[in-house]
Regions:
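N-terminal, charged/glycine-rich beta-strand/loop interface patches
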Residues: 1-98, 103-107
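Intrinsically disordered, low-complexity boundary segments flanking structured domains
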Residues: 2-3, 14-16, 189-193, 219
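Residues in well-ordered beta-strands of folded domains
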Residues: 16, 34, 51, 61, ...
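Short acidic-glycine loop/turn motifs at beta-strand connectors
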Residues: 52-55, 87-88, 116-118, 151-154, ...
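A structural signal for small-residue-enriched, beta-sheet-centric alpha/beta enzyme cores
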Residues: 70, 127-155, 192-276
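Intrinsically disordered, low-complexity terminal tails and inter-domain linkers enriched
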Residues: 152-199
């Protein structure tokens, strides 16, 4: 059974411990990430630190899409940073709703994951095209996001001191702290402090989307409307079922597209990759 052992946050971020029936039945812990007002203003900085201890299963979600509001006159972007340490045997799932960048918004995101040997990760980083119902499609000024994965030494310590918020999950009794910066600092002290010992990233994925009126994603997706972009990272044995489902879905979509384009018919899908 996994329990949240430390939770701390301060504006503009909110962390809401949750325990849906399915999560509880799986012996996992869950926490919803949110913000006051349902979105982030230009110049807001969110700095989240997460630690999943040995054998823990932690899910980080949101209750709705996060709006990225129009940048202020100075053009300073909205920033979100996530630093996570996943211990051996632990599974961290980061599955938020998509970001929704408003027209003339500016956003910079950074996700850093340090995994001990035997750790598993399912992480989704995705963005919608904006307020489509209001006629905004990819009308943001700038949008960039970067994901880094690195190996961490076993027992290398907890994630670094939280800025806007921090979450730790492990065994034992649950404890939660929240409120201002002092509370956030005490949460880190209780989990052991110190930065995660990580090597240089072995995987880096970076995306920059330049928006504006009439912009479209420059990907050939056939006749599919391109209203979202996503990066999905799947690592470790506990992520293997998700890998198989993604592979099956991708193969089915590719086959459907080939058939609709008058290409190969009755093509057989290749066997799924080895996820060991």
């Amino acid at each position: 059974m996994t329990r949240l052992t430390r939770v701390a946050h301060r504006a503009p971020m909110r962390l809401l411990p949750m325990q849906p029936p399915g999560v509880a039945a799986a012996g996992a812990a869950a926490c919803a990430l949110g913000s006051y007002g349902g979105g982030l203003l230009g110049g807001d900085v969110v700095d989240l630190h997460v630690s999943a201890e040995c054998g823990a299963v932690l899910a980080l979600t949101t209750q709705a899409s996060t709006k990225i509001y129009k940048a202020k006159a100075d053009g300073v972007p909205t920033q979100q940073r996530l630093t996570a340490k996943v211990a051996a045997g632990a599974l961290l799932v980061v599955a938020p709703d998509p970001l929704v960048p408003f027209a003339q918004s500016a956003y910079v995101g950074l996700q850093r994951y340090a995994l001990e040997p035997g750790a598993s990760l399912v992480a989704v980083d995705w963005v919608g095209s904006g307020r489509v119902s209001s006629g905004e499609r990819w009308a943001h000024s700038s949008f960039s996001t970067r994901t880094e994965l690195s190996w961490a030494a076993a027992g290398g310590g907890s994630a670094a001191s939280p800025g806007s918020g921090g979450v730790a999950a492990g065994g034992g009794s649950a404890a939660a702290v929240g409120g201002d910066g002092a509370a956030a600092g005490s949460a880190d002290a209780a989990t052991g402090g110190g930065a995660a010992e990580a090597s240089r990233p072995w995987l880096v994925e970076a995306v920059q989307l330049v928006g504006g009126p009439g912009s479209e994603l420059a990907f050939d997706l056939g006749e599919t409307r391109r209203d979202a972009y996503a990066t999905v990272v799947l690592v470790g044995s506990q992520a293997a079922p998700v890998v198989s489902r993604f592979y099956s879905a991708a193969a089915a979509l590719a086959l459907r597209r080939m058939r609709s384009a008058g290409g190969m018919r009755g093509a057989a899908a290749a066997p799924p990759p080895d996820t060991r």
